[in-house]
């Protein structure tokens, strides 16, 4: 019932497109969900470390490139999870580095129910350096050439889990920044709604559909991702987004604690009229289960 409602919700926003981005649109979003849904910090494993690299729209000058590193640890004695996040993203002339600390509290509501609250706090470091080519030989003072900026950042999230189903709401970049000059870079608030359900077939096979809605109330992205775990060491999946995007992935588990995955995505619509741009993602994770 819950999944049916969410699939209907996807169709309502299937015609909405995105035009720009401050936050990355990950294909393997469940691997970095601590970033946008801090309530999930330390919720599944005793220890979990993830490195994810994303190269978006290969062939496009100034394309977005992102590296995300995160770690989480479960503190079962105090029903909590702690961790940290480091992200660096380059788009055009700008580079933004984000360093965050994560905390979540896990409230048990029953044998199979868990309600979690979490937050990320940290700093955003912006570096902007441009080499403009104006139409005249005279320098244009309205074009910024270089800027360094540091801002405090705070995120919040809440998540409910019942057996194999979970749903969560996350909010990033909650703090407002005051403009000190005409070139001040401000971070827009982003809101996330995520849900998933894990179907088990025997001891090894699993089918997990996931839905993620991401918006800053200017644009909306709705991503449907379906993962099929064939056995203890191999999985594959498909994904689609309302922003004219299709993708596929493969991944393998090895040495019992490691996962290595790769995904490729293709974008349709206006950007494809220029050229065939593809996006690649690679993820490596290490987990020690409960």
Each predicted region: which residue ranges?
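Subset of outer-membrane beta-barrel
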Residues: 21-290
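Sec-dependent signal peptide recognition
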Residues: 2-9
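N-terminal signal peptide c-region/cleavage motif recognized by signal peptidases
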Residues: 15-17
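Hydrophobic alpha-helical membrane-interaction elements
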Residues: 11-13
């Amino acid at each position: 019932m819950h999944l049916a409602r969410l699939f209907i919700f996807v169709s309502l926003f299937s015609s909405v497109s995105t035009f720009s981005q401050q936050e990355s649109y990950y294909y393997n979003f469940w691997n970095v969900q601590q970033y946008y849904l801090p309530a999930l910090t330390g919720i599944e494993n005793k220890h979990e470390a993830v490195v994810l690299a994303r190269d978006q729209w290969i062939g496009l000058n100034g394309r977005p490139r992102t590296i995300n590193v995160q770690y989480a640890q479960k503190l079962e004695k105090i029903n909590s999870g702690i961790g940290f996040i480091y992200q660096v993203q380059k788009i055009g002339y700008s580079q933004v580095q984000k360093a965050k600390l994560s905390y979540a509290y896990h409230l048990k509501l029953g044998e199979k129910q868990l309600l979690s609250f979490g937050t990320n706090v940290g700093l955003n470091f912006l570096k902007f350096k441009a080499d403009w080519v104006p139409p005249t030989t005279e320098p244009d003072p309205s074009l910024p050439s270089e800027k360094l900026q540091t801002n405090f950042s705070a995120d919040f999230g809440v998540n409910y889990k019942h057996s194999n189903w979970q749903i969560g709401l996350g909010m990033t970049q909650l703090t407002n920044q005051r403009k000190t000059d005409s070139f001040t870079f401000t971070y827009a608030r982003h809101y996330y709604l995520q849900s998933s359900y894990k179907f088990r077939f025997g001891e090894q096979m699993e089918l997990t559909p996931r839905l993620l809605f991401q918006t800053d109330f200017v644009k909306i992205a709705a991503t449907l991702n379906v993962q099929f775990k064939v056995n203890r060491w191999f999985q594959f999946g498909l994904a689609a987004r309302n922003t004219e995007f299709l993708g596929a992935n493969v991944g393998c588990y090895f040495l019992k604690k490691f996962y290595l995955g790769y995904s490729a995505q293709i974008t349709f619509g206006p950007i494809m009229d220029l050229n065939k741009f593809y996006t690649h993602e690679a993820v490596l994770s290490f987990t020690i289960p409960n």
